[in-house]
Amino acid sequence: MKRAIACLLSACLLGALSAHASGTAAAPAGTSSGATASTELLRAVRERLVQSPVVRGAFTQEKTIKGFQNPLRSSGRFVVAQGKGIVWQVQQPFASVLRVTPDKLQSVQADGQVDFQLEAQQEPALRAINSMLFAVMAADVAVLPQHFDIRGSLQGKEGWRLTLLPRDKMLAQWLVRIDLQGDRFVREVRLQEAQGDSSVIVLQNPAAERALQAEDARLFE
């Protein structure tokens, strides 16, 4: 359960920063100076990110599990579709598909058999996390500072780095920190889980598109 939620968090944060809406939200009244600085940093990062309803590309992931000497490596492709969610299509070492939508987290094997599935209707924590992180996909820049202490900086003309430290007790059950870096696209996500596991996801050849291609649309079915 905790590993699934952590996977959901990293996937949704990636989607939030990859396929965001063009609008922005003002910082709420009474926001502290620290939260205001975080909001301004997020706004600056979003201005550097490409604005597109669909982002697709390839990825590699290296996951280190506490107690195991060798990391687990996987690779494949991803699709982020505004209003639909995120799909991770793992191609190596074993084919599988991870779908993250506003209402569901589902892992499916190559033969169509469902490995596991979490639905927001049955898991209140999933609904809460979905609600928060998919709000970010709507460019509500007031959301992240409410749940994370945010540190970071702009790098050169296009680059940026962010570190997210959970303030919310629920998030802290699963996460220690998330580190992201990128330019016009998210390029790397580092996730440190509370139970000691960690993941590094590198995104390769991301491309912005106006609509889902037919093969990608089928991944959301």
Which sequence ranges carry the predicted segments?
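Positively charged n-region of N-terminal signal peptides that target proteins for export
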Residues: 1-4
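Bacterial N-terminal signal peptides
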Residues: 7-16
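Flexible, surface-exposed loop/linker segments and immediately adjacent secondary-structure boundaries
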Residues: 113-160
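Short, surface-exposed coil-to-beta transition loops
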Residues: 73-75, 101, 172-175
